């Protein structure tokens, strides 16, 4: 069984390939011509399913027999911002680049008079194939701070300190991050489903 990842985000592709290294993984653009997918769901799970369905439906009939489309939708929910940016994490600033999104998050927090806040990351994984549709979910709790620290990671990693740590995700090694991340937790559950489907 082959897995096609319903994302063109290079950072996400690397992270997903690392965590799912027991499977034969292909990035979206290795199999299909890239196309835009409108993420108009109201939850992480809905958006993950929208992306996985779109990619699976774009495969030809032979490919559909060989592939499962796997998608991740994830984001950060900040308590003092009433759970925002949430499902809009990737496009929070309106510009779609990580630095602008981080800057907006810090500015919004400071506007409310806070230098840090409790926050949590959420990841929803969706899998779509001829056998049906499946989804899993993972969370990681911690706090966001107003100063970027660390060089690793992407997204909001340089602002987020996981619970039980004194470093941001961007200061942790790839292995340290992958062992605690929301995406890792959701993918560990997804692996169980994928192994069952592979036997079937």
From Swiss-Prot:
EC number of this enzyme: 3.6.1.66
Self-association and partners: Homodimer.
A Pfam family this chain is assigned to: Ham1p_like
Binding-site list for substrate: 7-12, 74, 154-157, 177, 182-183
Sites where the protein binds Mg(2+): 38, 73
Cofactor binding, note field: Binds 1 Mg(2+) ion per subunit.
Full protein name: dITP/XTP pyrophosphatase
Keyword field: Hydrolase, Magnesium, Metal-binding, Nucleotide metabolism, Nucleotide-binding
Domain of life: Bacteria
SUPFAM superfamilies, A to Z: ITPase-like (SSF52972)
Protein function: Pyrophosphatase that catalyzes the hydrolysis of nucleoside triphosphates to their monophosphate derivatives, with a high preference for the non-canonical purine nucleotides XTP (xanthosine triphosphate), dITP (deoxyinosine triphosphate) and ITP. Seems to function as a house-cleaning enzyme that removes non-canonical purine nucleotides from the nucleotide pool, thus preventing their incorporation into DNA/RNA and avoiding chromosomal lesions.
Disulfide bond positions: none
Cofactors (names): Mg(2+)
Organism encoding this protein: Campylobacter jejuni (strain RM1221)
One GO CC term on file: cytosol
NCBIfam families given in the database record: RdgB/HAM1 family non-canonical purine NTP pyrophosphatase (TIGR00042)
One term of GO molecular function: ITP diphosphatase activity
InterPro entries cross-referenced by the UniProt entry: dITP/XTP_pyrophosphatase, ITPase-like_fam, RdgB/HAM1
Entry-linked Gene3D superfamilies: 3.90.950.10
GO BP terms: nucleotide metabolic process; purine nucleoside triphosphate catabolic process
Homology family: Belongs to the HAM1 NTPase family.
Active site: 73
């Amino acid at each position: 069984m082959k897995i096609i990842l319903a994302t063109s985000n290079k950072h996400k592709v690397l992270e997903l390939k690392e965590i799912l290294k027991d499977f034969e993984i292909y990035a979206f653009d290795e199999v299909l011509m890239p196309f835009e997918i409108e993420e108009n769901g109201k939850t992480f799970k809905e958006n993950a399913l929208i992306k996985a369905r779109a990619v699976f439906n774009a495969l030809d009939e032979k490919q559909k027999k060989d592939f499962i489309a796997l998608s991740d939708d994830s984001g950060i929910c900040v308590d003092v911002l009433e759970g925002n940016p949430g499902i809009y994490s990737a496009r929070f600033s309106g510009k779609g680049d990580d630095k602008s999104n981080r800057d907006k998050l810090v500015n919004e927090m400071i506007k409310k008079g806070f230098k840090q806040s409790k926050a949590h990351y959420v990841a929803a994984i969706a899998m779509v194939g001829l056998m049906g549709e499946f989804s899993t979910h993972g969370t990681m709790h911690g706090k966001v701070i107003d100063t970027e620290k660390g060089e690793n990671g992407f997204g909001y990693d340089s602002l987020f300190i996981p619970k039980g740590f004194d470093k941001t995700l961007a200061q942790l090694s790839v292995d340290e991050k992958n062992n605690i991340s929301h995406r890792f937790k959701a993918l560990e559950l997804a692996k169980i489903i994928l192994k069952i489907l592979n036997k079937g």
